[in-house]
């Protein structure tokens, strides 16, 4: 293999995470000497930009190279990899198919990444056929076989799940929550009161995380503003949960001077003027020398669910629960057990207002390839059902974060890098399917008066 051929191989190896093709002994390539010299120079510049993850500039240069050399197959393959890296799977599939049409000698080498892009568009049947073709290719190495078999199991799971959970008339249609809430910065970790009229979420600006609040007024969300009080600091506050009645705010504070571990749980209380008290560390009963995050209060504020890396669990990060004692203190946390937790990581728990449906994410349960969203139902005080994957397209082949569900049991909110995003992660709302929704929860709003004083 000459120097230029190794260069092309290096380029595409960088783009595809698995880098399996760099180990194939029988890969065949175009003769670089027959490629337009200027196009090849532009392609080399694009490679340097890809190394620096300057994908926008890289894509521009790849397009320029194609104008000079319309049948430059490596450009299509490389661009397919970049599109996959930025999660534009439809364009990735299109470029793969164009390259394969031009020269089928490449198809055996690129069947595995092609299958991943197909899965990214939800074409799991075709992805399975493609990965099986790859596994039948002579001479592939053990690393490639292992990666392909893993992907095969994912595609088989997706096909089986779709058969067992027919969508019927259900349509997954995430709706961006608009400019009142979303900006060119990152918005994530939404939290909602039971009446659905107040949302608090995390916004990250220049790597600084703070809490913002928006109120639903006459059906429209107000422009989100930083929460008042002493909660937002020059440190990082995130992964918050507002109590169903809107009176408590529990959140994650990392690297605080008074912190016990790397990230601790803190609580603040609503004041009469609408602000928040100075946050209090929940103390060494809940917080450990390790990592605690993603709190979620039960509707009666008696149970606190959270994720932790403390010892005594099943994997790296598990979901735990602490019960509030009669004296108001939080009790020693209890691991939710092997039905919920795995030898992988579980996080972002959300206990619904029905006090039974627990939504969370995990990379340890079988799913679509990365971190997926699941729901488990409380059977009794210490037992949970086997988690149900929320399915495609709520879950994708990429990482999913947190999800919350409104009191109606169906309306859900989550953060996503959707095509309608203002920039990076935005907050979206959508409706859950019947089989994964929570129970509709009724609530009553009122005031309590003293019978004698009327106060």
Describe every region a protein language model picked out:
Residues 51-52, 85-86, 120, 252:
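Register position in tetratricopeptide repeats
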Residues 70, 104-105, 139:
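Short coil turns that delineate tetratricopeptide repeat
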């Amino acid at each position: 293999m000459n120097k230029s051929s190794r260069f092309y191989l290096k380029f595409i190896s960088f783009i595809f995470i698995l880098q399996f093709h760099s180990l194939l002994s029988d890969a065949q390539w175009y003769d670089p000497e027959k490629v337009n010299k200027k196009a090849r120079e532009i392609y080399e510049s694009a490679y340097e930009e890809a190394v620096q993850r300057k994908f926008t500039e890289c894509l521009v240069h790849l397009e320029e190279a194609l104008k000079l050399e319309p049948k430059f197959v490596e450009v299509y393959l490389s661009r397919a990899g970049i599109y996959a890296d930025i999660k534009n799977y439809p364009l990735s599939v299109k470029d793969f198919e164009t390259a394969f049409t031009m020269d089928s000698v490449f198809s055996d080498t690129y069947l595995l990444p092609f299958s991943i892009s197909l899965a990214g568009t939800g074409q799991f049947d075709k992805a399975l056929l493609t990965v099986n073709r790859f596994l039948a290719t002579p001479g592939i190495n053990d690393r490639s076989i292992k990666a392909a078999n893993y992907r095969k199991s994912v595609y088989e799971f997706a096909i089986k799940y779709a058969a067992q959970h027919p969508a019927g008339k259900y349509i997954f249609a995430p709706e961006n929550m608009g400019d009142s809430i979303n900006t060119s910065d990152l918005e994530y970790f939404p939290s909602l009161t039971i009446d659905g009229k107040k949302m608090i979420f995390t916004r990250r600006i220049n790597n600084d995380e703070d809490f913002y609040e928006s109120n639903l007024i006459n059906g429209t969300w107000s422009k989100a503003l930083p929460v008042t009080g002493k909660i937002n600091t020059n440190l990082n506050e995130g992964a918050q949960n507002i109590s169903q009645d809107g009176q408590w705010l529990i959140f994650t504070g990392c690297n605080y001077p008074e912190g016990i571990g790397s990230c601790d749980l803190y609580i603040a209380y609503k004041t009469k003027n609408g602000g928040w008290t100075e946050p209090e560390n929940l103390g060494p009963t809940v917080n450990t020398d390790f990592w605690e995050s993603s709190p979620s209060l039960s509707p009666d504020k008696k149970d606190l669910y959270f994720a932790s890396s403390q010892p005594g669990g099943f994997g790296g990060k598990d979901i735990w629960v602490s019960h509030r004692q009669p004296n108001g203190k939080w009790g020693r946390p209890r691991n939710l057990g092997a039905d919920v937790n795995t030898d992988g990581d579980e996080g972002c728990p959300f206990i619904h207002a029905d006090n039974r449906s627990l939504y969370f994410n995990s990379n340890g349960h079988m799913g679509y390839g990365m971190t997926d969203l699941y729901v488990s139902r409380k059977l009794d005080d210490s037992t949970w059902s086997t988690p149900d994957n929320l399915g495609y397209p709520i879950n994708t082949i990429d990482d999913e974060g947190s999800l919350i569900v409104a009191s109606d049991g169906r309306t859900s909110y989550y953060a996503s890098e959707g095509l309608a995003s203002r920039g990076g992660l935005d907050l979206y709302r959508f409706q859950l399917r019947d089989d994964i929704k929570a129970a509709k929860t009724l609530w009553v709003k009122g005031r309590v008066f003293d019978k004698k004083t009327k106060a």
